[in-house]
Amino acid sequence: EIRSIYEAHEKELLGDRPQVNTDGMDEQQAREAVNADYNERRAIMDVSPINVSFAGRMMFKRVMGKASFCNIADLKGRIQAYISRDSIGDDAYADFKKSDIGDIFGIKGFIFRTKTGEISVHAEEVTLLSKSLQVLPEKFHGITDTEMRYRQRYVDLIMNPEVKDTFVKRSKII
């Protein structure tokens, strides 16, 4: 839902603005042209930001010094959140860095598009709503043992969207 709101807002503000053409440029010139275009688009979009607030389970976290990215999942989907120490404060950022995969967070901020093109939320306030008692497995490895998947069905439903979709469809049929 957040993605569709942002894309409609972006289309309204940027209109028919063409993508930057890098044909005939060397790698350095192309990179500079793409960065300049990104900065211009970001400046236009930052004039009227879309503020959002949402809650969900943290499924993935990348900490990079003073800033972090995390994926937050709820019933409707996943969205990436950008959390910087400058935006939320030193104490809140230190608490966030100690958090685990599976914790449930409430995030308030504004929507933006990263340089890689992914729609994200720049967090201005991060609240831990519920601490995960059991740390979830890593995103890339997940649960590989079949017996463990059946014994810890709740973890499999959280980690694998395909399993969750099958479960929901089966429940609707019955």
What are these regions (language model features)?
Residues 1-174:
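Class II aminoacyl-tRNA synthetase catalytic cores and aaRS-like
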